[in-house]
Regions:
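N-terminal regulatory/effector-sensing and dimerization cores
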Residues: 6-115, 147-153
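Flexible coil/turn residues that form the inter-helical turn or adjacent wing/linker of helix-turn-helix
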Residues: 148, 208, 257-258, 269
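Hydrophobic/basic alpha-helical segments enriched in Actinobacteria
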Residues: 47, 52, 70, 131-139, ...
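An amphipathic alpha-helical interaction segment
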Residues: 118-200
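Hydrophobic recognition helices of helix-based DNA-binding modules
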Residues: 101, 162-170, 230, 254
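Basic/polar phosphate-binding segments, predominantly the helix-turn-helix DNA-binding elements
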Residues: 168-189, 197-248, 265-294
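Intrinsically disordered, low-complexity basic tails/linkers immediately adjacent to helix-turn-helix/homeobox/MYB/SANT
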Residues: 263, 297-301
């Protein structure tokens, strides 16, 4: 369908990166490669399938249950190469929107009145997280509005709400560092960086037989130092986090694919459908067979 039929907030890669407005880049394809691009503050995800992003030599495979939050100026490459189509969904904020949300959060009311437009750049590290959290839910609300071809005014308000959730996510990232009990700030930052390496490695292959030892090796940390630090930073043990992420991936696969329950069971690292169904039912209150399965995706543009 021709591009002129897409809403004005849905843009093309080559004319959307000036940071002058909020835009969404989305499309379904089996093969795509975009090398060496950088954006304003942005969020990368997938509506279905998976998209590979590479940043500074690191690989992030983004599924429909994950998102990648990138700071202003991070240079990346994008690749889709699959037998079945994947739909990427990328949100590019206008320059200053997220920074203004941050300014409003950390600045005293008196200073906001005296200098309401004194907005500074917001520095943060790229962040990979589950789409079932607050930021992901705000992103899903925007994606639903875009799919429904909502009015530009409605979508603009959703961008503002999403920007506020981005700031909350950045705050949580900083609190994760603060919660670590190392004395030196540089040590806390390094521990957090290594924990993030491990989480990204696990996200890349949830079906692998992860043990504490293999998780710790991915973080280049001693096993029990890794376990203690992970619990301090994220508020849950590595085992509990892995169990939650596997169930979240299963839920999204049930909602977005035609895979059988058995295929999904194996895809997230379970070897028994009975055990998988019991764990799923305990977490969500319904068996996998009770989840509404998807209709074929409707491509609007």
């Amino acid at each position: 369908m021709a591009d002129r039929q897409a809403p004005p907030y849905v843009a093309r890669c080559e004319n959307s990166r000036g940071g002058t407005r909020n835009v969404v880049l989305t499309g379904a394809t089996s093969h795509c490669h975009v090398p060496n691009f950088s954006d304003p503050v942005s969020i990368k995800t997938a509506c279905y399938g998976e998209v590979e992003w590479r940043l500074e030599g690191r690989r992030y495979v983004i599924h429909a249950d994950t998102l990648l939050l990138l700071p202003d100026g991070d240079e990346y490459a994008l690749t889709i190469d699959s037998a079945t189509p994947s739909r990427g969904f990328n949100v590019l904020f206008r320059s200053g929107l997220v920074e203004d949300c941050w300014h409003a959060m950390i600045t005293k009311p008196e200073a906001l009145l005296d200098a309401p437009y004194d907005v500074q750049p917001l520095a943060f590290r790229r962040r990979l997280e589950s789409k079932l959290g607050p930021l992901g839910q705000a992103l899903e609300a925007l994606a639903a509005a875009v799919a429904a071809k909502a009015s530009p005014e409605c979508v603009d308000w959703l961008f503002e709400s999403l920007g506020a959730k981005v700031v909350e996510s950045v705050c949580e990232q900083r609190w994760e560092v603060v919660r670590l009990n190392a004395l030196r700030p540089a040590t806390r930052l390094e521990i957090h960086r290594r924990l993030e390496l491990a989480r990204a490695a696990i996200e890349d292959d949830l079906a692998a037989p992860w043990r504490l030892l293999t998780m710790a090796r991915a973080a280049m940390m001693a096993p029990h130092h890794f376990h203690r630090s992970f619990h301090q930073a994220y508020g849950e043990t590595p085992r509990a986090w892995l169990a939650r992420r596997r169930m979240e991936r299963a839920l999204i696969l049930l909602r977005t694919t035609k895979w059988s329950v058995t295929d999904i069971c194996f895809a997230i690292g379970y070897s028994s459908t009975t055990s998988f169904s019991a764990s799923f039912t305990t977490r969500y209150g319904t068996p996998p067979s009770g989840v509404v399965r998807p209709r074929p995706p409707v491509e609007l543009w």
